[in-house]
Amino acid sequence: MTYRTTYEIQAVEIAVHLFGRFAFVSLFFFVILQIDNLANCIMTITELIQGQGTAFSFEVLPPKKGEGIEELERTVETLLPYGPKYINITTHHSEPVYKRLDNGLVEVEMVRRRPGTVAVAAALQYKYNIPIVPHILCSGFTKEETEYVLLDLQFLGISNVLLLRGDRNPNDAMFRAEPDGHQHTTELQEQVNRFNEGFFVNGDPIPSPGVPFSYGVAGYPEKHDEAPNIETDIAWFKKKVTGGATYGVTQMFFDNSKYFTFVERVRQEGIDVPIIPGIKPITSQKQLTSIPRSFHCDIPEEFTREMMKAETKEAQFQVGVEWAVAQCKELMRAGVPSIHFYTTGQARSVNEVAKQIY
């Protein structure tokens, strides 16, 4: 209350001194609105999704290296009318890029195709006054680099993050952490927890600790592709929750029964945090194979048949939208607290789905 009162008094003094009564009233309400927006940005995700109805959120990708932010802003502005409670932004580690040299040899260079997550997160949060949730990865980052990310985010007033292991290098059979990096999300959680407690990764105390981070983790209704079975995967999810995660957000799925079964089994383990379903509209026949290959999820036969009947690109798009709408309506009837949409850089399909359910 003191925080708000201080700003109100300053607004009154400036307005009366410079502009008189009309400006005083206008500026007073402007300041109140901005402080309310600021309050939203420092709320946790579990606080933001509380209340009646099913909350809306979505994920975006940072621009490719060398590209501008305008296309990303258009994606955000397309989906703003549906009142997103927060927006996730992905983080990308370096990937191998192969270049053929003049002598016929091949050179391998590690390149981050989409840098700038922290800067873009700050730009979006302060432009749109919506909480932004950057992803923090084990993959491709050392503990010290992770610490720098946490410090940068804290300076920028971003206190919600999603902690993930991240994908393995495509050339590796198994995930390999960076030297002095984290092998598992649970190890990354331990670092964030210690940071929240006021300690750097080397054990030194942080002179001026900031607002502690609140974080979520991933859940896999069809199990993580490296898990030997669903029981093992749920045990890992439970470990992440007991380690400090306040919510889970699932990998995309296309059969709601997989989500409902996952939630039921998780609840049987005594886990009561919100589990937010992740939805991605499939909008082309090509995605029937590319999405399972990339995200290790099944596509129902009924949906596959309908998609294969569609002869034009627009017809395929509509089949995918209709399936996602049906998924969302069933999830909403079941009382899910929120639905999280994966845009993968394309807002049109999510816009068409949201238009019909929000």
Regions found by a protein language model. Give the residues of each.
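N-terminal amphipathic alpha-helix/helix-capping segment at the start of soluble metabolic enzymes
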Residues: 41-58, 200-212
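Active-site mouth loops of central-metabolism enzymes
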Residues: 57-71, 133-144, 214-232, 309-322
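Conserved, mostly hydrophobic/aromatic
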Residues: 59, 87, 153, 240, ...
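Catalytic domains of carbohydrate-active enzymes, especially glycoside hydrolases
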Residues: 75-90, 242
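Glycine-rich, proline-tolerant flexible connector loops at the mouths of alpha/beta enzymes
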Residues: 85-115, 168-179, 246-259, 344-346
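Catalytic cores of alpha/beta
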Residues: 143-152, 261-264, 284-286, 349
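Flexible, glycine-rich active-site loops centered on histidine and acidic residues
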Residues: 143-190
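Active-site pocket-lining/capping segments in soluble small-molecule metabolic enzymes
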Residues: 166, 179-212, 217-226, 264, ...
